Swiss-Prot record:
Pfam families: OSCP. It is a peripheral membrane protein. HAMAP family: ATP_synth_delta_bact. It comes from Streptomyces griseus subsp. griseus (strain JCM 4626 / CBS 651.72 / NBRC 13350 / KCC S-0626 / ISP 5235). One of its GO terms (molecular function) is proton-transporting ATP synthase activity, rotational mechanism. Keywords: ATP synthesis, Cell membrane, CF(1), Hydrogen ion transport, Ion transport, Membrane, Transport. This is ATP synthase subunit delta. One of its GO terms (cellular component) is proton-transporting ATP synthase complex.
Amino acid sequence: MNSASREALAAARERLDALTDNTSVDAAKLAEELASVTALLDREVSLRRVLTDPAQSGESKAELAARLLGGQVGGETLDLVSGLVRSRWSQSRDLVDSVEELANTADLTAAQRGGNLDDVEDELFRFGRIVGSDKELRSALTSRTATASAKGELLRSLLGGKAQPVTERIIVRLVTQPRGRSLEAGLDSLSKLAAERRDRMVAVVTSAVPLSDRQKQRLGAALAKLYGRQMHLNLDVDPAVLGGISVRVGDEIINGTVAERLEEATRRMAG
């Protein structure tokens, strides 16, 4: 996003946080309604262009949103959308991306209120690993010929009763409304958004064998000291690394595995 869109999204995040600080607001319902607005804006290209047209006044765009959504969504959702369309946007799709982020954030807030946010973070990571290792499942979830309804039913059969309701909802939305993203990129964005709810960063840790609780605590503390923020550790076991651990934080990789050292030694010998 360019600066105008980033500023608009930052303001919307603040409005959402202020709104959901009030525990009487139903965060899950808010998420559902914002998700429906996302689908509408993604589908109606001309509408989102009108709602982001800099030649139109913010008030006229807010009035249009109110006419379209009035009676279909609650007052809190309408207030958030009105604030969004009053803002200036660098591109019309940035508005859709932002409404979608607010929907996911509202759902994650619902999980946080229920004390289930850690479970949601872990389930998102594990689901990504399952999809990455099951080509048939990934193909079914990303097929262009399968309907959104069929994909949703498949996911509900896989996740229903086995994952937190919030996890199920946001994964179903991601798969049925991919909006041009790969499944992996979408899951990664959701994991980062979940971590941000606790002002944490995400570290993907790969080791040959499971880490002990003490090792996890020490690693988390070391990474927090290194990056200046608390870390959520997504743990992956891969015997192929042979020994040691590999840590990925964002685009940065700290690799201390035996496999990597052997590969490096081989490169040096070949050179």
